[in-house]
């Protein structure tokens, strides 16, 4: 397909004094409409920074790490902080802290930083160390992330941390199920967390510690390996995955594929993997994951590719687009003067434009990286702080032109809202809401969310509490209108009728076993807290 018309603009060149080496997952949009990110280094302290920048490239340094040694506040933040539902930013540093093995921090929009946790406080670093990727705030309000090293088996961990700083290691990798997770996690529509490990898994592949994995883990710490990479289907997935509008997960591998230069894959939440694209010398070694933009296509970056004479030996890197069918088009090739090695991936701002960073390159010979924007002609939209939740759950909406807003709707159901500023409003999931787009009616027109909000169903009770095959059971809950299936015990499909948003009747099917009652909707699966007893 023909590439869309695009315009790349270098907004800022880092020069050391304002930071250098912006690295993984470099930018996030704040409630003020500005973009926030980190640099892993800065002149004088080499501790790195947290910064904010306008869409035009006016940069403000909010925090300098390691103002004096030892660096108990952290050093080398590799990933951007995320915007918490409380309006603060939460992130990690790769090094520093009490034990110099990394930290989790909270920062106000004004730049006041609090260290929430220092890693390697437990014997043999059983709590993990060297967090490398971005955090995710789940629907339970806690933050989840990974450490590249440490844990009970020394191969990295998955952790949970409360907003106040209480950390729990919920899983330690052991090589056979994965090793050295580099990026963070996502919470998918089923409520589970998904991620990748850069090593482990298939130990017979060419990589010394395995070619890496894709995994699923519950918030309680039950891990399932979905796929072990073999090399030909990809190797070393250093970036995480994204859940697309079709419900599948998409991601990249740095190496492997038919050319051993990286690959793009699609994988279902049950673990069926489909190779989508194999990179070659024209664009290779993606270190960042993908985003699905408002046009339905996927956008990403490769760390290498382009003219090897400018950036020896493999080029300065590229920005690319992939259709849902797997057709890849290179949109921009970096030439060093406008940046090199876009390792951090892209963010689509609510103005429709893409924003990103390069780790190196830039004008003036500083080679400390750049901040850039890329327009492909997409229009404005709204984004949500959470895209999954139950009725009455609070949420934040980012966008522009909110002053004078006259309505907020969850897939057509009106919701209460408060306009906080021209770029931010708060709302709650209304009763009767169904999975679908969120829309905001502003004086300038209707803005639609870039992704559907998935309303989680709830099963509150059922009657009778027991019965034989053929018994009709009345199930009471919330958000049941879009029910796709009902199951008893081991979730053998049952015939059912949706009576209302709060009631479903189902017939106990042949083969049902004693256990919880579950209802699946496009928003996920609701499971009862009590068991239905199947009588003989």
What are these regions (language model features)?
Residues 474:
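Conserved beta-strand segments that form the floor/walls of ligand-binding pockets within enzyme
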Residues 1-469, 486-488, 500-512, 517-536:
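Extracellular beta-propeller repeat domains
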